[in-house]
A protein has these predicted regions:
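C-terminal catalytic lobe of FAD-dependent flavoproteins
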Residues: 1-70
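Acidic, proline/glycine-enriched N-terminal capping motif
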Residues: 24, 51-172, 177-179
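Glycine-rich phosphate/pyrophosphate-binding beta-alpha loops
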Residues: 29-37, 277-278, 401-409, 413
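Short glycine-/aliphatic-rich beta-strand segments at the starts of folded cytosolic domains
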Residues: 129-155, 224-246, 367-377
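Glycine-rich, acidic/polar active-site loops that bind/position phosphate-bearing ligands
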Residues: 183-210, 230, 282-287
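Glycine-rich, acidic
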Residues: 211-212, 216-364, 368
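Glycine-rich, small/acidic residue-mixed loop/short-helix segments
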Residues: 336, 340-429
Length: 429
């Protein structure tokens, strides 16, 4: 026997037309038991030969499979160099021409820096600079039930999010744990545009699709991530620069913070979002990916007289710490809830059921034990490595999640988890 298949059952299968060894094996499950053909391989071949009239050598089902003879992927020629998937933004060769140092972000090749990141940060703070943000996720939601669907998927509220408005949003798991943040914009009536982090774009799109199959929602979900690229242009001179090339009123009154607008540039449609991940005046500009390279070069050429410089991910990390903005997954882990992470303001729990609501209610009732807080070092202090312990009175009480030298402030800054009772400004560790 193999997988409880008897000789009689094998003969019946052959009589029913499964007289080819491969089809016989799959129809009867011969050779698919725990041994994966190791013990019954020869017996099955002989029985199949007797019942089909083939020779034993012709009736061999297939070779044994793991765990009898595991096949290493390392046998594939040049795996490390030729089989690693790589994703590049449309501006990839523009970055190479500028002498970029790349960073691997999953499969993406992202610009890490073009020069000293400290100098790049000062260009942002004192002038105007641009970063490629094409790797961010872009998901479009629409349909009659889109508000109800978003209210179930996300802990925030969006019914009053008007056309042209943008809102910060977080996502939590069914366990109430924070795993994503981004923005949601209503760019047209009934059409919502969600911007996600680079690492979670595919997971969130899959999550939306999965939940649509479980509920009676009339909603359309489009993953626009591959077809839409983008840049973030930021700095004190950005309004002056963009006003010179785009026919749009960039004044604070006409284009306030956390709003979005649509425009065209040399015939290319643009979606513009006034958001501030860097802590500086800035506009994220999204456009069809086929125009990515030409628009990057256009911005660099037109921005030369304004001192426009490119900057990379490492500089962005410095700037976001100067602002005090967390990154889920870097500053949080599998135990971090939104209240402790300081983003409880994005939760509206006075609505009907949504993903993670029960656990959020439990978290809210508990006394907060730890908090994620920004910190600064004394001038001259060594910048700690991410993950080192926070020490108070000779005992570890928390951990550093992010740390960088701030060229703007002149001392080290970062984010750390500390006891809630010691999280007020001014405490020393």
């Amino acid at each position: 026997k193999c997988m409880d298949v008897t000789r009689k059952e094998a003969c019946m299968s052959i009589d029913e037309g499964f007289d080819q060894v491969e089809s016989l094996k799959r129809y009867t499950s011969l050779g698919m038991g725990p041994c994966q053909g190791k013990s019954c391989h020869e017996a099955v071949a002989r029985l199949a030969a007797m019942d089909t009239g083939l020779t034993a050598s012709d009736a061999v089902p297939t070779t044994m499979r793991p765990p009898a003879f595991p096949v290493s992927f390392g046998l594939l020629s040049g795996r490390a160099h030729h089989l690693g998937p790589i994703r590049r933004t449309p501006m990839h060769h523009c970055h190479i021409d500028l002498g970029v140092k790349f960073l691997d972000a999953g499969a993406w090749k992202r610009p890490d820096s073009y020069m000293d990141p400290q100098q790049e940060a000062l260009y942002v703070r004192k002038g105007v600079a641009m970063i490629d943000v094409s790797t961010l996720g872009k998901i479009e939601l629409s349909g009659p039930d889109v508000i109800e669907f978003m209210h179930f998927m996300l802990p925030g509220k969006f019914a009053k999010l008007d056309v042209g408005r943008t809102r910060y949003a977080i996502m939590i798991g069914e366990d109430g744990i924070l795993f994503e943040d981004g923005t949601i914009s209503q760019i047209e009536k009934g059409k919502y545009y969600i911007s996600t982090t680079t690492g979670n774009q595919d997971a969130i799109y899959t999550l939306f699709q999965w939940w649509l199959t479980t509920g009676d929602y009339d909603v359309q979900v489009k993953n626009l991530s591959a077809g839409i690229s983008g840049v973030n242009i930021t700095g004190p001179k950005v309004r002056e620069f963009l006003s010179s090339i785009i026919d749009l009123d960039f004044s604070n009154e006409a284009f306030p913070y956390m709003h979005n607008r649509q425009a065209t540039l040399e015939g290319v449609p643009l979606n513009l979002f006034r958001i501030g991940f860097t802590g500086e005046l800035g506009y994220e500009i999204h456009f069809p990916s086929e125009f990515g390279e030409s628009l990057w070069n256009y911005f660099m050429e037109k921005g030369e007289s304004f001192g426009l410089k490119p900057f990379g991910v490492e500089t962005q990390r410095i700037l976001r710490l100067e602002k005090g903005h967390l990154i889920p997954g870097a500053d949080t882990d599998a135990l971090s809830n939104p209240y402790e992470a300081g983003v409880g303001f994005a939760i509206k729990d006075d609505k009907e059921d949504f993903i993670g609501k029960a656990f959020l209610a439990e978290f809210k009732q508990r006394e907060i034990e730890n908090r994620l807080v920004p910190y600064r070092l004394q001038e001259g202090d060594t910048i700690p490595i991410d993950g080192v312990a926070v020490i108070a009175e000779g005992k570890p009480v928390g951990r550093v999640t992010s740390s960088r030298m701030s060229p703007t402030l002149g001392y080290g800054i970062g984010m750390a988890w500390v006891p809630a009772g010691s999280s007020e400004a001014g405490n020393h560790f």
